[in-house]
Amino acid sequence: MSQNKRTTVMKYLVKYKILLMIIAFGLWVVAAVMSSKAHAADNLVGNITKQQLFDGYPHFVSNYDDYLLSSDEAKAVEQLPSEISLKVFFGTWCHDSEREVPRLLKSFKRTNVSIDMISLDLNKSEPQGRAKEANIKYTPTFIVYHENVEIGRIIERPEVSLSEDILAMYKDSKAQK
C-alpha cells in the first residue's frame, strides 16, 4: 500500500473514531438526563407528613428507628415552650436530610412543638415558592420560630444536637429582648 493510501485510510479512521466518540458522548448525556428526571419523579415535593415520608422512604424510617436520644437532648426538648415552631426544608434525595430529619422527628415526638415539613426537588424548590422566599440554599434547613418570629436556623447539621441548638436559640432570643 502506498504512503498516500495509508494517509487517506488513517484520516478516515480518525474521523470515524471521532464521530463514534461524539455519538457515545451524546447517548451518555441523554441517559444521564433521563435517569435524573426519573429519579426526580420519585421524590415527593411540597408539604409532607411524617407518615408520607416514612411510607415512601425506608432510609428515613431506619434512621428514625436507629437514633437514640441522649439525656441532654431530652432535657433540652423538655425546656422548650409550646410557642416554638419549626419549618423544615429538606430533600428526600439528600443524605444530610436522611440523617437529620429522622433525628428531629424522634427528638420532638412527644412535644407540642409544631413541625412543618416541606420536601424540595433537586433544585431545592417546590411549587409554592416557600423555599425561594426563605432563601433556602442547603438541605436540610431547619427554621426555628418563637411566637411566629424567626429566631434562628440550623443548616445541614447542628453544632451539638438539634434539640440543644434549638434551646440555645430560644435562650439567646429571650436574652436579647
Question: Which residue stretches match the model-derived regions?
Answer:
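Bacterial N-terminal signal peptides
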Residues: 21-32
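N-terminal leader/targeting and pre-domain segments
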Residues: 38-81
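Conserved helix-turn-beta segment immediately C-terminal to the redox Cys motif
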Residues: 81-84, 103-118
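Short active-site neighborhood of thiol/selenol oxidoreductases, capturing the structured segment around
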Residues: 82-92
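Thiol-based oxidoreductase modules, predominantly thioredoxin-like and allied folds used
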Residues: 89, 113-126
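Conserved redox-active cysteine motifs that mediate thiol-disulfide chemistry
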Residues: 91-100
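Structural micro-motif
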Residues: 134-144
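Non-catalytic, surface beta->alpha helical segment in thiol-disulfide oxidoreductase systems
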Residues: 146-176
